């Protein structure tokens, strides 16, 4: 399972907020909702967040093994 816990720490230390992501950087409120609820994001959105926050992918998301993961 992918979680976005690192994103919230990165956002806090960046000087940005969910408001500025939406208003200044055109990140949708539905994307913010997906981040809040650990829902899937596409790689373009992850790339945009990394660019806006000047960070690496691992500063946005973390993989955590879960019993709920789909069996391959």
Identify the function of each model-found stretch.
Residues 1-20:
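A short, Lys/Arg-rich alpha-helix, primarily the initiator
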Residues 9-10, 61-72:
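Short, charged recognition helix plus adjacent turn
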Residues 28, 39, 64-67:
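The DNA-recognition helices of helix-turn-helix-type DNA-binding domains
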């Amino acid at each position: 399972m992918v979680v976005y816990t690192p994103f919230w720490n990165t956002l806090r230390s960046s000087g940005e907020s969910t408001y500025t992501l939406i208003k200044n950087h055109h990140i949708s409120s539905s994307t913010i909702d997906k981040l809040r609820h650990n829902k899937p994001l596409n790689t373009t959105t992850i790339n945009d967040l990394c660019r806006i926050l000047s960070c690496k992918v691992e500063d946005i998301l973390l993989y955590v093994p879960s019993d709920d993961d789909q069996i391959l």
